[in-house]
Amino acid sequence: HDSRYPWKLMGDTVTAMGAIDDGYGLGVILESIHQALKYRNEWNQGIKVLFTDAEEVDLQGMKAAHQYNKEIFDNVGLILNIEARGPFGPALLFETSMGNEKVIQLYADHARYPFTYSLMNVVYHQMPNGSDFNITRDSIPGMNFSAIADINHYHTDLDNIDNISEKTIGHYG
């Protein structure tokens, strides 16, 4: 049970181009797969990728995947969910699964520039929305990441390619 399972949605809105939400997630996942394939002969585990939609509509894409295709979650040992509320700043680890000692240790040991603090989880749980990770966080270990600086770009016409940050994208991976 050591598969990595990043997932992402394409959740752009009518006015947003989706370069940040969720171009960041898509790009990070594709680059992660590209890098992982270079070392596939050294790995003992696999990688699964799930792209969902309708996160903003009560997590409907992830709920459907979990309800109707539950077998895709078999043998998944870790979920990485990539979010982007803003285009700038570090990729914050803002939520983990319960009993997270091993997950936090994995992050601390392997992230080049880990960035998190316990208040992030408190703030996140006060927000009116959730993430796809909500559906599995009680059953599969995982981590939720997001850049949040300049959230005024979120779901607006400012969510475009002119406002992406290569430094922020690089911090995710």
Predicted regions and their residues:
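Soluble extramembrane regions of membrane proteins in the secretory/endomembrane system
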Residues: 1-173
